[in-house]
Amino acid sequence: MPAHKKRNISCGLFAALFCLLLSGAAIAASSPTQQVPNGGKNMSRAALAEKKQLERFGNAWSPLEATDPDFAEMRDRLIWGEVAWHGSLDAKMQELITLVVLTASQTLDGFAPHVGAALQVGATPEEIKEAMYQCAPYIGFPKTEKALRLVNEVFREKRIPLPVASQKTVTEDDRFMQGVKVQKSIFGAAIDAMHKSTPQNQRHLLRDMLSAFCFGDVYTRKGLDLRTREILTFCIISSLGGCESQVKSHVQGNVNVGNTKENLIDALTCCLPYIGF
């Protein structure tokens, strides 16, 4: 590409950060936080990584250390020695974000241990299932089902009864109405304008199915609050790449439900090791 041409920012994390920083939304900012333990300022990245891995997984060893020790060191010290200690998001939110990012990108080799880690740091089986269900409108059912099968394997190993309690709140009669209600609570009057401007031959997609399925069937469910669902959605679509328009919309949506600029930057920080820059 000639040097004078404008660069097309299409990579997931950079694109999401670009959309976030250039958003016209009045995003409340907060001071960055670091979750380093007492005395932790004197701890090395290696020590911090080991401490965090023991908390999440019960051990700090990876088979990769036997074949690619330098790579394992780079990975573990970034994820567990830096990222896991950074920011405003608690361990449960970090693990839920990790699960949806791995699901969206279909990098499932290391997925199951993070299901266990999510349970270890306090996520309920219902919260984990709801985080998975939140992926479906954005990545489709087959990819979501692949991750769900792994979740279910972990639950069986831990003797967690299946199915978990239903979190459904809508009926066939009110799923569209309740979906529109949730949409408006996130995006405001823009929803009415979108419904009015949608061409007749696209209304079944951009009005009926979007409102009834994505927001009615999924967003109205119990188990996760609206702020959590929006920040997970932001991470899911950021992981996909090439979704700048949707990312911008959900930056505004996150603001509208009470998430801060720092929350979103911290969420992207959590995504970084799994989707790259």
PLM regions with names:
Residues 2-14:
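Bacterial N-terminal signal peptides that target proteins for export
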Residues 14-24:
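Bacterial N-terminal signal peptides
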Residues 28-91, 144-226, 256, 273, ...:
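Acidic, glycine/proline-rich low-complexity segments that act as flexible tails and inter-domain linkers
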Residues 90, 106-129, 133, 143-155, ...:
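Extended intrinsically disordered, low-complexity coil regions enriched in Ser, Thr, Gly, Ala
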Residues 91-95, 126, 227, 262, ...:
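Aromatic- and histidine-enriched alpha-helix N-cap/loop-to-helix transition segments
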Residues 93-102, 131-132, 228-238, 247, ...:
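Short, structured motif recognition centered on aromatic/hydrophobic residues
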Residues 103, 121, 134-141, 238, ...:
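A short structural micro-motif
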Residues 210-216, 220, 233-234, 241-248, ...:
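Long compositionally biased, domain-poor regions of proteins
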